[in-house]
Amino acid sequence: MEPGLSGERRSMAPLLEYERQQVLELLDSDGLVVCARGLGTDRLLYHFLRLHCHPACLVLVLNTQPAEEEYFINQLKIEGVEHLPRRVTNEIASNSRYEVYTQGGIIFATSRILVVDFLTGRIPSDLITGILVYRAHRIIESCQEAFILRLFRQKNKRGFIKAFTDNAVAFDTGFCHVERVMRNLFVRKLYLWPRFHVAVNSFLEQHKPEVVEIHVSMTPAMLAIQTAILDILNACLKELKCHNPSLEVEDLSLENALGKPFDKTIRHYLDPLWHQLGAKTKSLVQDLKILRTLLQYLSQYDCVTFLNLLESLRATEKVFGQNSGWLFLDASTSMFVNARARVYRVPDVKLNKKAKTSEKTSSPEVQETKKELVLESNPKWEALTDVLKEIEAENKESEALGGPGRVLICASDDRTCCQLRDYLSAGAETFLLRLYRKTFEKDGKAEEVWVNVRKGDGPKRTTKSDKRPKAAPNKERASAKRGAPLKRKKQELTLTQVLGSAEEPPEDKALEEDLCRQTSSSPEGCGVEIKRESFDLNVSSDAAYGILKEPLTIIHPLLGCSDPYALTRVLHEVEPRYVVLYDAELTFVRQLEIYRASRPGKPLRVYFLIYGGSTEEQRYLTALRKEKEAFEKLIREKASMVVPEEREGRDETNLDLARGSAALDAPTDTRKAGGQEQNGTQSSIVVDMREFRSELPSLIHRRGIDIEPVTLEVGDYILTPELCVERKSVSDLIGSLHSGRLYSQCLAMSRYYRRPVLLIEFDPSKPFSLAPRGAFFQEMSSSDVSSKLTLLTLHFPRLRLLWCPSPHATAELFEELKQNKPQPDAATAMAITADSETLPESDRYNPGPQDFVLKMPGVNAKNCRSLMNQVKNIAELATLSLERLTTILGHSGNAKQLHDFLHTAYADLVSKGRVRK
């Protein structure tokens, strides 16, 4: 067994020189660390986790994912740490969580659990050593973490707060974004570590890997398609600006349209007025998304996959034709022509043929048989083959380096990895032919023509992969060819070993059918077992790490893995000497730099494959430039930032920790009699556990109102013993109205509380309209949201609707509604369920007969209680006279309706109906 491939996993490499400087700075003073992408914020966090893995400490970690927590725990276990971090999830009973906290060490817990435990006192706040915040740039968007830090600082003035992030671009939006983040984190220091930092740059330059940049030239057809897509993209952007003059012109540039964050940028501008936009603008936004996908497919996948996407768009031409016409531009025609030319070509019809003859013989079926398949190979495939050939040649003379070096090929996603595996296993011809057959099954006759030509001399065949010798694909795989097939477990689908194929062209029918069964264009294809008749072994998963034969070659995706550290594990366990970057990804490039620097003396060569002059190259360069500009902006902000001494909240002078009206930015309303409603009783609100995903509980708490988190079946907020609130966002409101769930909720609230309230909360940055534009000029329908809302208020007369533009307005409204009112009881609120029968509000009435009586003509919510107070049961009600009913109901018309309903015979009703007809 070879070194580095044993069952024992390797521990994380020791800190580098500049990383030690980061740790010393952060140990000296709390702060926010902003690193460049890939420079190892996880390594920094891991070091602090290791420092505090001791029962004498109690450190909380926020904003980590389960996969990351598992990775950190495993790494600490490898290093022999005894007191490992623990996870606090909903599987641990609430009454036993206090014991978990008092055992000390590192605690990974969800934000909702921590908020509830802070509010209920289950967590010993005064014993907390500190809090580590991961992905600190999200502290404003995710309100729960900010709430936790505020609760922590209110009860603990000594503990530390250290925050980490590697997303500098996130601070580039909004006004004083980084300052607001630091305010929510209660930190005064900002530590910036860009890639161009002197300490980082000088150290990594001393240990930089050998980089071989290979600028691959796109084929003429690919260049023509790229130009056409860019022309269409530019036309759509101009039209979008024309229809929406208020949009920022700089952000809607063609360069920004190529980057990944463009969809988020355009939604940021259009969301506030999305309901006011016409169909044209909405269609253009969708078109931009499709065009960006086309650009990605062009450079990422093969010619057949790209053509299949285009043809599917053409198949939905009617849908697009109603909204936008980019499919009918000249550039679109050029794109389709060149995309088809990469896959097949139709021979020119001789001009001297008579028109009648051509009409008789040019049926669609006959024309299809005249297609000659071209199946243009991806230029990067050939570059990859050349690289593997070079690596193999070097491995033959690698005795001085300790044997052949392992190879790691990194592509963007699972689909690309599967295509590379199949290409290296079967060759370009077989792979593309199989994919063509799978995608365009109806063109069977055309395939036969191409296959027949292929078996002959084949002068018309123009597949690019034929330009190199047939033995070339197999030469690179001479060592892997003898390996056994791998059957990977489901959780290891992201790891794929490159397998060899037979030397001869797969002309045998059985072999071709075998190849056709291999999935190539779907992500699931990575999990398909590659079978060969000569190899029928089921080896363990260790075979994926090359224990059987050398040199080991692994293909791994850069993105899309369920485990974010899958690639890191492969890198450190396989220890490749050669890394082939099939796709450019900034984070992994930096990760390779750190990997090389942490292994001094061990060679590492990185092959960088990129299309020269392509949108792929432009995207990579734009990402670099945006990160550099973001750091430059942060450096300027740091130089001019004014940070108050009390920012860390270690004394009582920090206003952010104050509760009540003194802490609010809004001016005090003197009409409220100076707040005389505070008569010594602390205000409180009973809140449902599920509501802690929103920002509202945090804002209520900041207003000086205590929160009692419990599990409620009826309502979301209990403000007073009589006032129950059901909170709905606009989308939730519409869904609940359509499903009937809101009716059941209002029924339960009306039954058990005197003042049921429906709170409709909408985001001020996302205005909405319950009815489409021009709806009032049309006939109203019962399916409309407005109609259903009207029916709801008619059915529940005591139900009140509250419209709030933001959680801040809701918190202020709740405070006003609670003035001079008694406080709710959490135990009573928890006891109220949809099936409750004996309750303070309804202990005198049976809910079943009450609902039945309300359905009778003449009985409504106003006279129902009077009727139930004076009549014992339904049998007695049926014996009452009209005069007695008039006295009870207080209205002669209602009394007559009820009396007629109870005493009119069914036959009389039928006869009256016939008379009316």
Curated annotation (Swiss-Prot):
Region (HhH2, dimerization with ERCC1) residue spans: 838-906
Its subcellular locations are:
Nucleus; Chromosome
CDD domains recorded: XPF_nuclease_XPF_euk (cd20078)
Q: What keywords are annotated for this sequence in UniProt?
A: Acetylation, Chromosome, DNA damage, DNA repair, DNA-binding, Endonuclease, Hydrolase, Magnesium, Nuclease, Nucleus, Phosphoprotein, Repeat
EC class: hydrolase
Q: Spell out which residues are annotated as carrying Phosphoserine.
A: 522, 765
Q: Give positions of region: Disordered.
A: 454-524, 643-681
Q: From the UniProt entry, list the residue stretches annotated as the region Leucine-zipper 2.
A: 270-298
Q: Does the keyword Flavoprotein apply?
A: no
- Share an example GO biological-process annotation for this protein: DNA repair
Q: Name one GO cellular component term.
A: chromosome, telomeric region
Keyword NADP in record = no
* Assembly: Heterodimer composed of ERCC1 and ERCC4/XPF. Interacts with SLX4/BTBD12; this interaction is direct and links the ERCC1-ERCC4/XPF complex to SLX4, which may coordinate the action of the structure-specific endonuclease during DNA repair.
Put simply, this protein is called DNA repair endonuclease XPF
- The protein's organism comes out as Mus musculus (Mouse)
